[in-house]
Amino acid sequence: MKNMLFIAVIIFNALRVSASQETLIHGNIESGGFGGPVFKMGNIYHEAALMIGGRGGWIINHQYMLGAGGYALVNEIPSKQWANYNMDLGYGGIELAYIQNPDKLTHLSFMILLGGGSVGFTEQGRDQWDESQDFDTFYIAEPGVNLILNVTQFFRLGLGGSYRFVKGVQGDSELVSKDLSGPTLVITLKFGTF
């Protein structure tokens, strides 16, 4: 009888502990996903810069996003050291986001990109892989905030800002990390199930 009572107490305590356990994501997990183009405008190396890329991700319970993104410089930024050379710049990484009130017509999302990239200067008219000057790689952390508009059930439009924190650029003579760091205006088109 004592053994039965002892076992009943242990089972009751185990059920009570498991019922009160707190987790970040609780209940049934709802999944969605999205992808789409991203346009970034800002200053790089004291010049106006336009970067185009894309991002995609897994949306968990309509509020958390785990994904990836990649971006490349599309306009010409000339070298200040070598005549007829323009900057080649690209970066990417994992992206994490929290989406606040995703069911509202307009809402905010807070995100961060953590990754790496490369930068160098390529002679005009030549492929970037032929010959680059002052080529280097770097680490990047880019936190941002976006105002999101729910256009349709499957389309979201975002307008926001981010800041590129770049570290590790140690070019021979022309570029340093602060030349690539700075604020950015971001326009995002997202297609998927949210």
Where are these regions (language model features)?
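Transmembrane beta-barrel strands of outer-membrane/channel proteins
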Residues: 33-41, 54, 68-72, 110-118, ...
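Outer-envelope beta-barrel architecture signal
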Residues: 27-33, 62-64, 104-110, 153-157, ...
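Predominantly the C-terminal beta-signal and adjacent terminal strand-loop region
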Residues: 148-194
